[in-house]
Amino acid sequence: MNSYGISEIAVIALRKSPDERSEMVSQILFGETFEILETIDRWCYIKLTFDLYEGWIDSKSITPLSENQYNEINAGTQAFTKRLFSELIKNGKENVIVPFGSTIPTYNNDGQLFKIHQNSYTFNKNSFIENLDPKDLLLQW
């Protein structure tokens, strides 16, 4: 059975080997989804959904998703942050700062609320742009 996850952390280091001192080959931004391919101790070898990069991340940084949740998130409308840093409010009380290009999964332009797993997030709609490839977003910047 396949395992899936999503990042609820602003930036996660994607490493070449399962070690904190290992070279960082890429970064996972808030809202990015991935498939978990292998687990060794506290490390998971993952493949990113968007760009298919592969590497190791600390298992503590993973919010697990069921296959249905994973498919629903990736089939739905997504928005991306368009400011250098944008603020989200987690569960009505915790500020979360996310960088440019972060994904807002299951974006609903009727409101300013989305959920990841059991957490609810609110945001300022002016901080995001919907239905745009992140590569095109860079060109607008």
Q: What kind of region is each of these model predictions?
A:
Residues 1-3, 9, 19, 26, ...:
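Boundary regions of SH3-family modules and the immediately adjacent low-complexity/disordered segments
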